[in-house]
Amino acid sequence: MLNYMNEYEKWLHSGALTADEVKELQSIAGDEKEIESRFYGPLEFGTAGLRGTMKVGLHQMNVHVIRWATQGFADVIAAEGDEAKQKGVAICMDCRVNSMAFARAAAEVCAANGIRVRIFESLRPTPELSFAVRYYGCQAGINVTASHNPKEYNGYKVYWADGAQLPPQHAAAIAARLEQIDIFTGVKRMAFDDAVKAGLITLLGEETDKMFMSNVMAMINDRASVAQVADSFKVVYTPFHGCGWKLVPEALRGLGVKNLYCVEQQMVLDGTFPTVASPNPENPEGFYLAIELADKVGADFILGTDPDSDRVGIMVRGADGKFIAVTGNQTGVLLLDYLIGAMRRAGKMPEHPYFLKTIVTTEMARKVAESNGVTCCDTFTGFKFMAEKKNALEAAGEGHVIMSYEESYGYMLGDYVRDKDAVTASLLITEMAAWYAAKGMTLYDALQALYKKYGWYGEKTHNLIMPGLDGLEKMAALMKRLRTAPPANIAGVDVVVRKDYQDGSTVDCATGNVGKMELSGSNVLRFELADGTTILVRPSGTEPKIKVYILTKGADAAERDANIEKYSAWVKTLTE
């Protein structure tokens, strides 16, 4: 661990800070706890890049940390050779405070290192950055975004040539490189306007939007059903003050939606997210304005995309006519079942279709896929792993991936992006809602029909928050305890199989026989129980919390709900 007081003094007297930044550091002079939290070490550079609160300090998101991270990334790109520098990087940003300044700072560092830059003139959805990397044949990509985190946060996501987030070996190479670079004296910079004049920086805009949207619109399977209900079918949409504001409505109107109502207060681009406590479509509370509008106009379907427009959440009217949130697990199952049928009806289904999900995503999705002749593969959490699996399957000629999704509201569709994509997902979820509307069904009705057909599956995710400097220690201690003294039963139900994705081992609890899984190298534990329930435990990659996933099934809705309650009570004992 760094000597945080020395690091604090180094920053204070570096001569690299603005007067405001110096003033901010002087204001915490007597607060050792605050100094420690800002300077005890650098933000960890992982496969998702960097994420943190926006303050002055080494363990924070600010222009100095952005430049430093970019210098490390630039060195890794340059190590690939001159051709890689020529292919260059695509850079994008979201609506957050400082996102544009951070993106331009990253562009200046790349240009100073002789790396060609294509930077969006203004904020864009994350999937469009993935698309731009692939479309322009770039070596890499940088996206300044903290996705759905609270307004105090920003982040720095890095992509490689396939348009997916960095694989672990490249992330490790950058992290190693950063240890060699001084944050102030080790960074090259070239003024933005000078780099534009020198031809090292090019601005991207409408032309890239058009190419991206032509790919999105080619994903439509069934315009006829949309046209059939167009006069009565009403959609309410909110971008939560973020990047979906332009392209999602464009996609829905292009699909043939005549009655699209956007939540005006949340169509305002604003990185302080003034109308919501959290701009996360996983939180139903954020949809209160959308529900008001839907009730006013008589809509029964609501879509919301997060600030960088890579994740989408939906709300539909339940049996009593009131709006209920449809979870990411449920939305994915609905969309998968719909797409399999729609692609077959449209003659678009590949010969050997594959479907990808993460290990913590509902097993109902596997049932839907396999019942319909689609092969299901599991990956670790994160779209870089799904992108990697898609690339591998398709390169080997084994089949073609029609959809990939994870329970946290992310869907990857089509072949033109390698990250979660709320623009395309919003389009296809809306097409699906219209198709069911043409049959006189809401998406709530459709979901109940799927439960009757495939089984009463249920899921719940618990977040065990462990804040503070000792949070990481508490997280590690809990994982260690579950490894070294695993439970023989959970809530009175026997554990039948234990799986540890760290080393890829499986243990048959009855015989003690040890086996090997295909997947390994991730800090996740899995307990498979005698009643068919699965419980997974893993530390979050971006926040100080342990995530516990309950994946269960009942003979009917009542038994499913009782199972969720029973296992949720056990989860609460983990922190006692």
Spans of features found by a protein language model:
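N-terminal small/polar loop signature for handling phosphorylated ligands or for N-terminal nucleophile
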Residues: A90-Y153, G256-G313
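An N-terminal, well-structured beta->alpha segment
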Residues: L2-N3, Y8-A106, A195-V235, C243
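Short Gly/Thr/Asp-enriched flexible loops that form oxyanion-binding sites at enzyme active sites
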Residues: F102-C110, Y153-W160, D310-N329, A365
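Phosphate-binding and adjacent anionic-ligand microenvironments
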Residues: D295, A299-F301, K322-I324, A342-R538, ...
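Gly/Ser/Thr-enriched, mixed-charge loops and adjacent short helices
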Residues: E34-L43, N154-G286, E292-A294
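Glycine-rich phosphate-binding loop plus the immediately following alpha-helix
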Residues: Y159-R189, N329-H352, K357-R366, A422
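Conserved phosphate/anionic-ligand binding catalytic regions in large, soluble enzymes, centered on
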Residues: F39-H59, A146-N149, P239-A251, P307, ...
